[in-house]
Amino acid sequence: MRSYRFSDYLHMSVSFSNDMDLFCGEDSGVFSGESTVDFSSSEVDSWPGDSIACFIEDERHFVPGHDYLSRFQTRSLDASAREDSVAWILKVQAYYNFQPLTAYLAVNYMDRFLYARRLPETSGWPMQLLAVACLSLAAKMEEILVPSLFDFQVAGVKYLFEAKTIKRMELLVLSVLDWRLRSVTPFDFISFFAYKIDPSGTFLGFFISHATEIILSNIKEASFLEYWPSSIAAAAILCVANELPSLSSVVNPHESPETWCDGLSKEKIVRCYRLMKAMAIENNRLNTPKVIAKLRVSVRASSTLTRPSDESSFSSSSPCKRRKLSGYSWVGDETSTSN
């Protein structure tokens, strides 16, 4: 039997008021302490290069310190726990159809927090609570419709947290991040970089969508923590360019990407590009048997007719069905739960 008390950890860490109305209707600029203008990736292509250079100059303030990756390599931080948390964030992002930026911001908040503050445990309930709080904050920054704190806890969570516990964790995250939530991300660069390769804009949609997929598919891998958002965006665009026969012959990642904007590092872009290519090969190797198995299941399923009146089948797959609570462990400020 393991006893969890959040009050000792959170009360010592948070010195804010208990007035939780702060999280109900504030403007997103309040969280960042900066301008409330929303710099979406779709607008980046129309900005001059010096504006993008300003993002490159500022991105260092929105990433963990340079030794963060080494903490996973030395196992002072649990890489598998981080990977599980990121995987859960991506599942919830897909479940609620959140923007890719929301998921990326949630992971960014989590990494910056873990760099600056040590959790009472490197895995288990502390990491899950942190992931829920970071995703909630990211959704409040970017989404129009935000689920309740209870409804965030879907997609295979092991513990259920009370709303007041999550809110206090949100305050702790805000405090540790100095309320700087308007982070610089790869999505601030990909449209601009795509135009550098394809000035006509013919393949712009293809570039943005596929680069976004590459970025999110690699976000679980701790090795990418070595690279800043601009390098990740440039490397992703180069990977996409090599998928297009009309562009792959003229795109050389070893020659041109650092000329797209002042402040880019050729060495980091090339290294990140190589890592993405290696990860793509590895993922294809691991996923091929699963894809074949799924295709076989689909073929078998398609040969079986399902009666329209089969209400039990419908109700079991309905996303609106009531969630069962018996498989979860409740965790609150003054309660204990066994692990």
Curated annotation (Swiss-Prot):
Provenance organism: Arabidopsis thaliana (Mouse-ear cress)
Q: Which domain of life is it from?
A: Eukaryota
Tissues expressed in: Expressed in roots, leaves and flowers.
> Which family, according to UniProt?
Belongs to the cyclin family. Cyclin D subfamily.
What role does it play?
Answer: May activate cell cycle in the root apical meristem (RAM) and promote embryonic root (radicle) protrusion.
Q: Which InterPro entries match?
A: Cyclin, Cyclin-like_dom, Cyclin-like_sf, Cyclin_C-dom, Cyclin_N, Cyclins_cyclin-box, Multihaem_cyt_sf
PROSITE patterns named in the record:
CYCLINS
Q: Which gene encodes it?
A: CYCD1-1
Q: What biological-process terms (Gene Ontology) are attached?
A: cell division
State the taxonomy lineage.
Eukaryota, Viridiplantae, Streptophyta, Embryophyta, Tracheophyta
- Translocase as UniProt keyword: no
Isomerase as a keyword of this entry, yes or no, is no
Q: How does it assemble?
A: Interacts with CDKA-1 and KRP6/ICK4.
Which PANTHER family does the protein's record reference? CYCLINS (PTHR10177)
CDD domains given for it? CYCLIN_AtCycD-like_rpt1 (cd20543), CYCLIN_AtCycD-like_rpt2 (cd20544)
| Keywords assigned | Cell cycle, Cell division, Cyclin
**Signal peptide residue numbers:** none
Q: Report the protein name in the record.
A: Cyclin-D1-1
